[in-house]
Amino acid sequence: MIMKRLLFLVSVCSLCMVGNSQNYQPEKHAVVKSDRGDGRLLSTYAIVHEMLKDTHPQYAYRSGMSAQEFTQWQDGVRAAMVEIMKFPEIKRQPSPVCVKTEKKEGYILEKWEFYPFPKSVSTFLVLKPEHLKGAVPGVLCIPGSGRTKEGLVGEPGICDKLTEDYNNPKVSMALNMVKEGYVAVAVDNAAAGEASDLECYDKGWNYDYDVVSRFLLELGWSWLGYTSYLDMQVLNWMKAQSYIRKDRIVISGFSLGTEPMMVLGVLDKDIYAFVYNDFLCQTQERAVVMTKPDKENRRPFPNSIRHLIPG
């Protein structure tokens, strides 16, 4: 008798679940809205989505600003960027050191080490025209997601699994620059390339940016703040080189690399120009309109955790 009752209850629950599943139509939930007459929202997602929609950034660009207002706006954006990037003040670290020089056809390839934190080392690559006479413009090249400084200079990766299609001119940004007579400097993004962890053994270019980003968020910092801080050290090194024109330093970024590129462009007035190789969008608007559930019945979010900045 007990078993029959259990089977009956299971059957009823199953029918209810099937009924609910059959009644669910994802397209009807593509736009976030209230089912109540008073317009109030019950879903936590819907509530925080409404908060985001009603957020008005303090330094959002306003068309029609006067020259004076525009200058004040620039200064405000720069001050806010300093605050949210949270660059540490670390002193008494060793100066960068050239650890390898290799002559190539028409240019010189150098590998440099620098020491941004105690107990840390990072690297960058420099391409210099072979017959360099006097100072020339310099270009700081930043790779996109899953890419490396080695690919930018047209060289194999530090291991087979991190080797890209480096002979492709759409990949070898820095190599293209030195062929035009510029000094090109290439860096890795945080947690990628030579700065990655275990990827050489298994995942290859599918870098685990997220775990590093989580650690940094726990520290009150961010992936972008960390990456931009390292890139700023390299930029400052470039300014100190006699063969690079300080008044003609350009930053060029691919995809993910456009983010630290924009940070440096805001913070450093000496940057002459930057080359933005990515799509453009209004980030807040993108987050507001991307609400349609995906095939796993989850609402999407436009950016991964590596793009998040506290504050």
Model-derived features with residue positions:
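Alpha/beta-hydrolase fold nucleophile elbow
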Residues: Y243-S255
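Glycine-rich nucleophile elbow surrounding the catalytic serine of serine-hydrolase chemistry
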Residues: G253-V263
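Bacterial Sec-dependent N-terminal signal peptides
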Residues: M1-E27, V31-D35
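N-terminal targeting or regulatory segments adjacent to alpha/beta-hydrolase or S9 domains
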Residues: S21-I108
